């Protein structure tokens, strides 16, 4: 039995470094890998290799992101670090790099700066709930009172965006000194990682969440009934489970799954990530369509009005060449389908330029199964002009 090999020994968590430019995010990432590598838990990545992040394309948007992985005694981590500010914005909004928690890097020499604020706001909007603060470059500040002051400022800023500013752990250190092999600084990095282990909870596995499957295709099997197929987004489904067909219509259809198939073979249980066909009892072909979802009863509702945090593609990324204004009517691509919606810009925002990120309100012309944290693209005549995430449900 060669099954042992696949056992996950440690829980897996995705984290990333966020914070203002030149405050030391990449240096810290390098320092973490170096300090853990000395304990045999990682491969050291140097600053240059992390900084030369490869380009990736996520939903048509070009993003530079460095991925490093390492382990602590307790966990396995995938850590993302993006070189430029624009890369962070795109990363967080598209969910190209899903973060369970973040390390906010603030230089003690500067204190919170504009991008510190922006990254905290983005974390709040896209649903990163846990932040640990690393106060960097503390070796360059002689005065402890000054450090206390900077720490207070950071805590106040976090509280302003509804994070528990008073309770968030703040670790003081110097990433550069740790990279240079200073023992005290290395101990600070270990303290940081112990804190991340303790403070950022292990995320719920996708299979433990309530069942949800966006419907991609519908067909009829003569004598057996209607099959809805798609990729299971979360949770599990098996024969005998009750599910609801939700979206695009005001009425929710309740049904029971009478068969689950994958690659034309029957399956005991489909789980998150599987592409399956679900045979639905007593459902007419006309009652289910692409763009709806199959879901555990009561777990998701339809909405027409929401706020979204959106990155607007530049001309070079294939986006619009011109700005848009309130009452702009593009399509919003949720799950597997486009629905037209009307945009209302926030007060004080006259127009949105390609390359901007913005929070706006959308009113859809049909109800869609949406929830906070759901990703979508904004499209115009079939081409992507923006990428977003639902930050609030408004109806």
Swiss-Prot record:
Residues 174-176 are annotated as: G5. GTP hydrolase that promotes the GTP-dependent binding of aminoacyl-tRNA to the A-site of ribosomes during protein biosynthesis. Residues 10-204 form the tr-type G domain. This is Elongation factor Tu. Belongs to the TRAFAC class translation factor GTPase superfamily. Classic translation factor GTPase family. EF-Tu/EF-1A subfamily. Monomer. InterPro entries: EF-Tu_GTP-bd, EF-Tu_GTPase, EFTu-like_2, EFTU_2, G_TR_CS, P-loop_NTPase, Small_GTP-bd, T_Tr_GTP-bd_dom. It comes from the Bacteria. The keyword GTP-binding applies. Gene3D superfamilies: P-loop containing nucleotide triphosphate hydrolases, Translation factors. PANTHER family: ELONGATION FACTOR TU, MITOCHONDRIAL, ELONGATION FACTOR TU-RELATED. Residues 81-84 are annotated as: G3. It is found in: Cytoplasm. Its main location: cytoplasm. Residues 60-64 are annotated as: G2. Its EC number is 3.6.5.3.
